[in-house]
């Protein structure tokens, strides 16, 4: 564990040095092709850095933070767009807004979130889920699918929520939440656009959706341009997920996760088009039914296309094993420090 932590520290030292170069050099170059050329070496480096750590958590988070989000942010920054425009006021802010999945909250709203103990409940529930892997061989495929889905969601939220709080305090600013109770989604558009991993649509919208829709709008009607913009966003998301799965498994991509996002892109675009018709506007469905249909569709298609590659490669079990290992590592260090403190006193 300690050797892997040292590798992670080295990776992030390289990342911070590279982003510092962008802050001091690329910001002085006029936006456009030349600024893009100045950040491209950093983007290439960010594609390589996750390969220097072997832990599933470390390689996955580094790939998500740097290879995906940071690269997209730097490309958008090259054209004075995205979260890095206007340029943050100092280096530390520039590094944080580039490296981490955070976005400044433009119009802070009154807090309407679950109580503070909600995070503790999710943390405790996640601990129960980890122990359920000991009985995996006795579970039906349906129960396993629910277990995998809850594991991915809770692990994401448990890792990202404290990071948001820490950075919000450090930077003295309000930051957008990463999740908005996705299990309450009433449609695919609601799930992907307003509730699940919100930093991703915040990046894909200016980077993919708007440019594609604008270009398509010159030769297509508005509905067709919208469909193409949504489809392109999901296609790009699928390709990037294939890359992240490669960092996870170090195996050749299978295309399954890309098909998962292509399917959801088509269904989300069709849903958006259907909502504009009179029939659907008049057809009222209860929120409970909408939530069951939406979450059920996401989970079932995930079991068909998203999870199989991870399950075959044993990555989900490795995530659980590493979580147990990390908890044990923290306990060991905690008791070691307490013992040393008692000996000194």
From Swiss-Prot:
It catalyses: a long chain fatty alcohol + a fatty acyl-CoA = a wax ester + CoA. GO terms for cellular component: membrane. The keyword rRNA processing does not apply. It is found in: Membrane. The chain crosses the membrane at residues 5-25, 36-56, 114-134, 143-163, 226-246, 254-274, 288-308. GO terms for molecular function: long-chain-alcohol O-fatty-acyltransferase activity. Keywords: Acyltransferase, Lipid biosynthesis, Lipid metabolism, Membrane, Transferase, Transmembrane, Transmembrane helix. Its EC number is 2.3.1.75. InterPro entries: Wax_synthase, Wax_synthase_dom, Wax_synthase_Magnoliopsida. GO terms for biological process: lipid metabolic process. It is a multi-pass membrane protein. Pfam families: MBOAT_2 (PF13813). Catalyzes the final step in the synthesis of long-chain linear esters (waxes). Belongs to the wax synthase family. This is Probable long-chain-alcohol O-fatty-acyltransferase 4. It comes from Arabidopsis thaliana. The gene is AT4.
């Amino acid at each position: 564990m300690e050797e892997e932590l040292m590798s992670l520290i080295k990776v992030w030292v390289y990342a911070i040095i590279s982003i510092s170069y962008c802050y001091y050099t690329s910001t002085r170059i006029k936006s456009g092709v030349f600024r893009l050329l100045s950040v491209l070496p950093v983007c290439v480096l960010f594609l390589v850095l996750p390969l220097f750590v072997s832990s599933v958590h470390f390689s996955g988070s580094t790939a998500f933070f740097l290879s995906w989000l940071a690269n997209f942010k730097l490309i958008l920054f090259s054209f004075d767009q995205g979260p890095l425009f206007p340029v943050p006021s100092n280096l530390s802010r520039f590094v944080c807004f580039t490296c981490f999945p955070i976005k400044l909250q433009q119009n802070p709203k009154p807090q309407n979130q679950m109580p503070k103990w909600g995070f503790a409940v999710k943390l405790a529930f996640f601990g129960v889920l980890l122990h359920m892997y000991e009985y995996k061989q006795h579970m039906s495929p349906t129960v396993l699918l629910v277990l995998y889905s809850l594991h991915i969601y809770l692990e994401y939220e448990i890792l990202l929520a404290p990071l948001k709080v820490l950075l919000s305090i450090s930077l003295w600013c309000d930051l957008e939440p990463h999740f908005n109770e996705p299990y309450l989604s009433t449609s695919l558009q609601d799930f992907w656009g307003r509730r699940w991993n919100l930093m991703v649509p915040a990046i894909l919208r200016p980077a993919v959706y708007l440019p594609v829709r604008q270009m398509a709008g010159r030769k297509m009607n508005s509905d067709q341009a919208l469909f193409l913009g949504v489809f392109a966003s999901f296609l790009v998301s699928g390709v990037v997920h294939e890359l992240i799965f490669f960092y996870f498994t170090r195996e050749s991509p299978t295309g399954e996760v890309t098909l998962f996002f292509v399917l959801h892109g088509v269904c989300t675009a069709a849903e958006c088009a259907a909502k504009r018709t009179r029939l659907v506007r008049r057809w009222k469905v209860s929120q409970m039914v909408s939530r069951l249909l939406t979450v059920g569709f996401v989970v079932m298609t995930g079991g068909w296309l998203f999870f199989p590659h991870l399950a075959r490669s044993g990555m989900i079990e490795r995530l659980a094993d590493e979580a147990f290992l990390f908890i044990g590592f923290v306990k060991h260090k905690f008791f070691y420090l307490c013992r040393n403190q008692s000996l000194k006193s």
